[in-house]
Design a protein with these regions (language model features):
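N-terminal pre-Walker A segment at the start of P-loop NTPase domains
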Residues: 267-277
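N-terminal cationic and glycine-rich segments that engage phosphates or anionic surfaces
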Residues: 130-139, 393, 409-411, 422, ...
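Accessory helical-bundle/CTD segments and flexible terminal tails appended to RecA-like ATPase motors
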Residues: 513, 532-542, 549-556, 561-564, ...
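Upstream accessory/linker segments immediately N-terminal to the RecA-like ATPase cores of bacterial MutS
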Residues: 74-264
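Inter-lobe coupling/hinge segments of SF2-like helicase ATPases
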Residues: 275-278, 286-607, 671
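OB-fold nucleic-acid-binding modules
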Residues: 38-69
Length: 698
């Protein structure tokens, strides 16, 4: 048997150099192996032949057997189309094509018997099937073969006659060459224990299943394997890291922590905060490097927990550092932490790109001597000139905004890697967290401090703008501030949505007595900061902005968030924007403004937003609606999880199950030396070579 991974796809029957080039560029298919692992996205049952008299326009797909009675062309220019009148003796349907008219008239013969497959629609009382699949009836076995696979293709592929049907034919050719079993990629013990189909059977049946039951078994086998190796990679990496990096032992909770707890704590900790703090304290004293992800909705008190963790580092003679993605957020953390530590003998400094000259020199010197105990900053803290006396704990806010390499540079700031606490206000569904941040232990703050009023979310149509502005005026008259967010900076030729510039002028006219500031992504940082400062200080009553305000603005007096063209935003983005209000004691409102015409999934998104403020429920729904590759931040996380068949949203239970299976193997075989696991470690090594990011997790 030849090696599928090295056999060039151009040598497969029906491919050749030209088609191979298209497959290379469009789908990343270079070898026989790549094609074999290009799975169908759906299957259509072609086991039944319908009679024309049975069909109506509401049926999804149908298959007919009959003959072409004749052809005619209709329309002019771009509307020109070929119509074939097709009959099986019980009625007539019109087969319609808008392209390739000459070719089709030459290809199909009148009064010859064909199998036709497609989606019926009704137009002017007649049944039509546009661009159907047609095969000569003599090839009935090829067409009516039960479940037919459908493969995703691109426009460029279709222009090269590489549609789903063409890929299916290539796959038949490839599967026909598998005359002996492929090398197994799971151990005999795993196959037996979990009742998994052998690899060769699974691959043949995923492309050409003999029935629904066999298809389910093939899918299960391939999903199990895919998710299993993702988890085995993450868990093996975590185990190796624990062995390699011992981590500082923070033995005590001392005077600094206790003094803060008894005198400076602004309010009683919630039960969730207490639980998370216990988890962190346990990690810090365990003698292994902490690598923990702290999730919590906006306003849940993550910063307070992070500060108390840093105070434990100080009590044990170490320094702590907090890294934020923007200057505004770093400034905000600095002000908050200084306020919380008021009256305590703790030196806190802020280091951003704006800090220069003698001030910067004094901070760098203080870090080297250990006088600066807590440093808060942006990516400026990872510059080569920044060195610590004894960095023991690093807190990273908004993890997904830092690349793997940036985070790794923090490790070089200490004799051995410091403890790492990653904070995010972007709720990550449990299943996605296991894949994206699987080597991090996860803590969740899932309750808000007492006294916070839930934000009221309302969906309003564009036409109700008069009543909307009346409500805004009432809030401003009561001394509150308002955000108005737009999805685009300037008008697009293709999409006519409200843009920020127009919106800004309109709001200035509508509220002439108010100061309106404007913030968008194309501004210079200094200009943006100046505009934001107008709003933070209360000088401006209204901020008109794009989504740059998702992270980093804390204005307790802002009580209204209006999101224009809310249909243009994803669920997680809407939730993050909503989190800019509801930070004070007053009732806050989030108003989602849309047009009347909404797609079904958009309607669902808006209904979820109106129904719940729970970030984790929203994140799970977003994952189901959009898929993991679209979720904010995941593409920048530095982790490849380009799953070919498994679905993080739908296969959450299986992911949990295979994680436990992988954990058992890593625990029993930490050195990868047991003979029964040889296949698994060999396959993992091969996957790490082909998936470049697998070696650089979190």
């Amino acid at each position: 048997m030849f090696d599928l991974t090295t056999r060039d796809i151009k040598y497969l029957s029906g491919v050749g150099p030209q088609r191979a080039s298209v497959l290379n560029k469009e789908l990343g298919i270079f070898s026989f192996h790549d094609l074999l692992y290009y799975f169908p996205y759906k299957y259509v049952d072609r086991s039944r032949i319908y009679r024309i008299r049975e069909i109506d326009g509401a049926m999804p797909y149908i298959q007919l057997k009959g003959e072409i009675l004749g052809f005619e062309t209709a329309g002019e220019g771009r509307q020109r189309r070929l119509i074939a009148h097709f009959s099986d003796g019980t009625g007539i349907v019109d087969l319609i094509w808008f392209q390739g008219i000459k070719y089709l008239i030459g290809k199909y013969k009148v009064h010859q018997e064909y199998i036709v497959f497609g989606k019926p629609t009704v137009f002017n009382g007649r049944i039509n099937i546009a661009h159907p699949d047609i095969d000569p009836a003599s090839e009935l076995k090829l067409s009516a073969m039960g479940l037919q696979p459908y493969y995703n293709t691109t426009e460029k592929m279709k222009r090269s006659s590489l549609n789903s049907h063409a890929i299916e034919k290539m796959m038949k050719s490839l599967v026909g060459q598998l005359n002996e079993p492929l090398p197994e990629t799971l151990s005999p013990a795993l196959l037996a224990e979990h009742h998994l189909m052998p690899l060769t059977d699974a691959l043949m049946n995923i492309h050409f299943p003999s029935g629904p039951d066999v298809l389910r078994k093939a899918e299960y086998r391939l999903k199990f394997e895919e998710l299993f190796y993702v988890q085995l990679n993450i868990l093996r990496y975590a185990k190796d890291r624990q062995r390699k990096y011992r981590g500082y032992v923070f033995e005590k909770v001392g005077d600094i922590f206790n003094g803060f707890y008894s005198r400076n704590l602004p309010f009683e900790l919630t039960n969730a905060q207490k639980r998370v703090l216990k988890e962190i304290r346990r990690d810090l004293g365990a003698g292994r490097q902490m690598n923990r992800l702290l999730q919590g909705d906006v306003g849940s008190g993550k910063t307070l927990v992070a500060l108390m963790s840093m105070l434990i580092a100080l009590d044990n003679g170490y320094q702590a550092c907090m890294m934020a993605p923007t200057e505004i957020l770093a400034n905000q953390h600095y002000e908050t932490i200084r306020e919380l530590l008021y009256g305590m003998d703790v030196r806190v400094e802020l280091l951003t790109g704006s800090v220069k000259g003698k001030r910067r020199e004094a901070i760098l010197s203080g870090l080297l001597t250990g006088d600066v105990q807590i440093l808060i900053g942006t990516h400026a803290v990872i510059e080569d000139t920044v060195n610590f006396a004894s960095l023991g704990l690093v807190v990273i806010d908004e993890q997904h905004r830092f690349g793997v390499a940036q985070r790794a540079r923090l490790w070089t700031k200490s004799v051995q890697p410091p403890h790492i606490l990653v904070m995010t206000a972007t709720p990550i569904p449990r299943t996605l967290a296991m894949t994206l941040y699987g080597d991090l232990d996860v803590s969740v703050i899932d309750e808000l401090p007492p006294g916070r009023k839930p934000i009221a979310t309302i969906h309003q149509f564009d036409s109700h703008r008069v009543s909307l502005y009346r409500s805004v005026r009432k809030q401003i008259d009561e001394g509150r501030q308002v955000y108005i967010v737009y999805p685009l900076i300037k008008e697009s030729e293709k999409i006519d949505f409200k843009n920020l510039e127009e919106g800004y002028l309109h709001i200035c006219e509508e509220f002439p007595d108010c100061r309106v500031c404007k913030v968008h992504g194309k501004m210079k940082p200094a200009e943006k900061d100046a505009q934001m400062q107008l709003f933070v200080s209360g000088e401006a009553q209204i901020m008109v902005a794009t989504t740059v305000i998702e992270v980093g603005v804390n204005v307790p007096n802002a009580s209204v968030m209006i999101i224009e063209n809310a249909e243009r935003f994803g669920l997680s983005q809407l939730h993050q924007l909503r989190g800019r209000v509801g930070r004070g004691a007053d009732q806050s409102y989030c108003i989602l403004v849309t047009g009347y015409k909404l797609a079904e999934d958009t309607r669902k998104r808006l209904e979820i937003m109106v129904r719940t403020n729970d970030g984790f429920e929203i994140a799970e729904a977003d994952l189901k609606l959009r898929g993991p590759g679209d979720l904010e931040g995941t593409q920048q996380s530095g982790i490849a999880f380009d799953l070919k068949i498994a679905d993080i949203a739908r296969d959450g239970q299986l992911l949990q199950y295979v994680r436990e299976v992988a954990q058992t193997i890593v625990d029993k075989d930490p050195n990868g030396s047991l003979p029964e696991n040889e296949i698994l470690w060999r396959q993992l090594k091969a996957l790490r070579k082909t998936n470049v990011n697998w070696a650089a997790i979190s």
